[in-house]
Amino acid sequence: MSITSLKNQKEFELINKLGKKLHERYFILVIATKLPKIFLESKYNTFLGIKVSRKLNKKAVVRNKIKRRIRHLIRIIVSDSSFKDIKFAMIIIPRKGFEEINFSHLNYELSKLILRNI
């Protein structure tokens, strides 16, 4: 399973428009399974965008740590065999409290949301 990031504002806007917004306590997930031609022709199956606002934390070090945690979570979830032939794109927007919650709880919540909506 190969993962790549959303590269520019146009891709983010496209996923925001086509995707379904799902709200959880610690994050917002925008997930799109019906992808435009640009994404379908790609060799990658999963497209990931992460938006970490300055409102969440003023320090760039903390915001980067949050991004690393999210990327690692997605790698774990997508490595599951149930995602083998599915192409989808998602944007994850963490909320306040995301950095304090433990990793296993985040993994459970995020995987539950993704599996339910693919």
Swiss-Prot record:
<comment type="subunit">
    <text>Consists of a catalytic RNA component (M1 or rnpB) and a protein subunit.</text>
</comment>
<dbReference type="GO" id="GO:0001682">
    <property type="term" value="P:tRNA 5'-leader removal"/>
</dbReference>
<keyword id="KW-0694">RNA-binding</keyword>
<dbReference type="InterPro" id="IPR020539">
    <property type="entry name" value="RNase_P_CS"/>
</dbReference>
<dbReference type="GO" id="GO:0030677">
    <property type="term" value="C:ribonuclease P complex"/>
</dbReference>
<dbReference type="Pfam" id="PF00825">
    <property type="entry name" value="Ribonuclease_P"/>
</dbReference>
<dbReference type="InterPro" id="IPR020568">
    <property type="entry name" value="Ribosomal_Su5_D2-typ_SF"/>
</dbReference>
<keyword id="KW-0540">Nuclease</keyword>
<dbReference type="InterPro" id="IPR014721">
    <property type="entry name" value="Ribsml_uS5_D2-typ_fold_subgr"/>
</dbReference>
<keyword id="KW-0378">Hydrolase</keyword>
<keyword id="KW-0255">Endonuclease</keyword>
<dbReference type="GO" id="GO:0042781">
    <property type="term" value="F:3'-tRNA processing endoribonuclease activity"/>
</dbReference>
<comment type="similarity">
    <text>Belongs to the RnpA family.</text>
</comment>
<dbReference type="GO" id="GO:0004526">
    <property type="term" value="F:ribonuclease P activity"/>
</dbReference>
<dbReference type="GO" id="GO:0000049">
    <property type="term" value="F:tRNA binding"/>
</dbReference>
<comment type="function">
    <text>RNaseP catalyzes the removal of the 5'-leader sequence from pre-tRNA to produce the mature 5'-terminus. It can also cleave other RNA substrates such as 4.5S RNA. The protein component plays an auxiliary but essential role in vivo by binding to the 5'-leader sequence and broadening the substrate specificity of the ribozyme.</text>
</comment>
<protein>
    <recommendedName>
        <fullName>Ribonuclease P protein component</fullName>
        <ecNumber>3.1.26.5</ecNumber>
    </recommendedName>
</protein>
<keyword id="KW-0819">tRNA processing</keyword>
<dbReference type="InterPro" id="IPR000100">
    <property type="entry name" value="RNase_P"/>
</dbReference>
